[in-house]
Curated annotation (Swiss-Prot):
Similarity comment: family membership: Belongs to the universal ribosomal protein uL29 family.
Organism expressing this protein natively: Rhodopseudomonas palustris (strain BisB5)
Gene name tied to this protein: rpmC
Annotated protein name in UniProt: Large ribosomal subunit protein uL29
Family matches, as InterPro entries: Ribosomal_protein_uL29, Ribosomal_uL29, Ribosomal_uL29_sf
GO cellular component term, pick one: cytosolic large ribosomal subunit
Keyword Ribonucleoprotein assigned: yes
Domain of life: Bacteria
Lineage, broadest ranks: Bacteria, Pseudomonadati, Pseudomonadota, Alphaproteobacteria, Hyphomicrobiales
Amino acid sequence: MAEMKTGDIRAMSDDQMDDAILNLKKERFNLRFQRATGQLEDTSRLREARRDIARIKTIAAQKRAGKTK
């Protein structure tokens, strides 16, 4: 999965964001195991997945804050 763009994330519904976070967490889990066993070739993917999760969580929080105002 390539790095997610902010515009794509903003277009997602809350349920889609939750699903994306869950998928990225699973991917990170698998990537960590691959790194530990020496099978991981693209080590930058770990960083991208971590940042994608943070990006989605940030936009979700902004959406929630906008709805409550």
